[in-house]
Amino acid sequence: MMNFEVSTTKQIGVGLTTFGFFFIFLGVLMFLDSALLAIGNLLFIVGITFIIGVQRTLVFFFEFRKLKGSILFFGGILVVLFGYPLFGMIAECWGFIVLFGGFLPGIVNLLRSIPGISTITYLPGIRQVLDRLAPESKYPV
């Protein structure tokens, strides 16, 4: 029998990751405020580490096939810290897409299955974008 309880460490990780996204979003809203973006990046990375562990985080970010995405992501963080938030965020976003692009179809399908959010995902402009990211399955499973 499998244990599906979420440990305290993973709960803290989810909270830190959520706060990281919130601070990054707030930093973008505040016209690319470097301090908020830096705090958000730090919280995001620490949260991911708490969720999957130190060893798996290092393996994930420094896997050979994901090295380009990692260099862009961490390089973008450094560029933000050095005071060029626009260029840093562009590099970070590109690196984020390269690193986490494999998870996008699963995330899109999850959003399509949530009752309140699914109606938003089927709006005309949003549906075309999401269909390119993750085409709908033709077969009911």
Curated annotation (Swiss-Prot):
Task of the protein: May be involved in fusion of ER-derived transport vesicles with the Golgi complex. Involved in regulating AMsh glial cell size, acting by modulating the E3 ubiquitin ligase rnf-145/RNF145, probably by mediating the translocation of rnf-145 from the cis-Golgi to the trans-Golgi during development.
InterPro entries according to UniProt: Got1, Vesicle_transpt_Got1/SFT2
Secretion signal, residue range per the UniProt entry: none
Recorded topology in the membrane: Multi-pass membrane protein
Residues in compartment: Cytoplasmic: 1-11, 55-70, 115-141
Cross-referenced Pfam families: Got1 (PF04178)
Name of the protein in question: Probable Golgi transport protein 1
Ribosomal protein among keywords: no
Any single GO CC term annotated in Swiss-Prot or TrEMBL for this entry: membrane
Gene: eas-1
Stretches in topological domain Lumenal: 33, 92-93
Annotated transmembrane regions: 12-32, 34-54, 71-91, 94-114
Location within or outside the cell: Golgi apparatus membrane; Golgi apparatus, cis-Golgi network
Entry keywords, A to Z: Golgi apparatus, Membrane, Protein transport, Transmembrane, Transmembrane helix, Transport
